[in-house]
Amino acid sequence: MAKLTARDLKLSFGNVEVLKGVNLEIKERTITALMGPSGSGKSTLLRVFNRLIELYPEARVSGEVLLDGQDVFKMDVIELRRRVQMIFQIPNPIPNLSIFENVALGLKLNRIVKSKKELEARVRQALEKAQLWDEVKNRLDAPAGKLSGGQQQRLCVARALAFDPEVLLADEPTANLDPENTAKLESLFLELKKDMTIVLVTHFPAQAARVSDYVAFLYKGQIVEVGPTKEVFTNPRHELTEKYVTGKLY
């Protein structure tokens, strides 16, 4: 079953076309990797899924994006972003806030919890799901900026998970991490997909091969090929895909 669907999705900034008639189905409780060279439209597509693209007034969008069959452009945007959370290439916790408050803040601002006890339980649950609890449970009052880069990224995952989202969008989340923390985050994604849908933007074909169930290869704003990961990597149908997965196209 498709969790997210894009139909004839087009996007431009002024006279520059960034997405050119994208059609894509993201299956529920899978990891779908969006891969392709820089400038192919991967991160832009991700930002359309939860309407972050609306932060750019010059962006013009046409076509459809559906979440469980519902038009996201007709949904309440706050509700949409609660259900479709996002993490970014550069970890972005609020550095001077405590580890606890970084996870708790969104819950409090959106009045999702009704008591201190419930808040504490939700924060702990999110940190446990992000595989960070054991590392920070004795210093929850410490500033988030004191965490390592890998820990900060997992804190951002915990912050997203606190909302109990259905979809997690991840925009090159390991680009600034060392191999050890990259492996931790990839392992985390494999665990999280049991309960949610993950869309991962990556510049690294090897990462897509390691963690994704499906891949979509984008080139110059168009989807060239989409399919099960193993099939796309071992038997690509398009010459451009073959060049990309073998390192001949950057």
From Swiss-Prot:
SMART domains in the cross-refs: AAA (SM00382)
Topology class, membrane: Peripheral membrane protein
Entry GO terms, CC: plasma membrane
Keyword Transport carried by entry: yes
EC number: 7.3.2.1
UniProt: ATP binding residues: G36, P37, S38, G39, S40, G41, K42, S43
Keywords in alphabetical order: ATP-binding, Cell membrane, Membrane, Nucleotide-binding, Phosphate transport, Translocase, Transport
Any one GO molecular function term: ATP hydrolysis activity
Principal place of residence: membrane
Subunit structure: The complex is composed of two ATP-binding proteins (PstB), two transmembrane proteins (PstC and PstA) and a solute-binding protein (PstS).
Protein name: Phosphate import ATP-binding protein PstB
Organism: Pyrobaculum aerophilum (strain ATCC 51768 / DSM 7523 / JCM 9630 / CIP 104966 / NBRC 100827 / IM2)
